[in-house]
Amino acid sequence: MKTPLLDIPASYKEILADVQKNINQVISSGQFILGPIVEELEQKVATYCDAKYAVGVSSGTDALLISLMAAGVGEGDEVITTPFTFFSTAGSIARLGALPVFIDIEKETFNIDPNQIEKKITN
């Protein structure tokens, strides 16, 4: 049996009608980037996160890349991450010329093991 890496239709089956309605609204407006619909989303996300700003981007990969850039990550830097993640995590780090430093996960939580972080820091 072939298992897909990402099964988008199955992941949003319950909200399909609402998603299609909103996609049609965006297409009808002719504003695929920026515009009032994106601004409204950004304001709602900022409010929900109790943040001053939120920026809509085209993908999770872009979100990771912009976050790393905002943090000042660049050539030769080391960024601690987990190998138990989507490949864009390490890819975004490497794209900026930085080095992903992998730390294993905790068996109980599947999150990065904080007890291993300090010994991986090199400077």
Regions found by a protein language model. Give the residues of each.
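Conserved PLP-binding active-site segment in aminotransferase class I/II-type PLP enzymes
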Residues: 1-70, 74, 96
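PLP-dependent aminotransferase-like
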Residues: 69-123
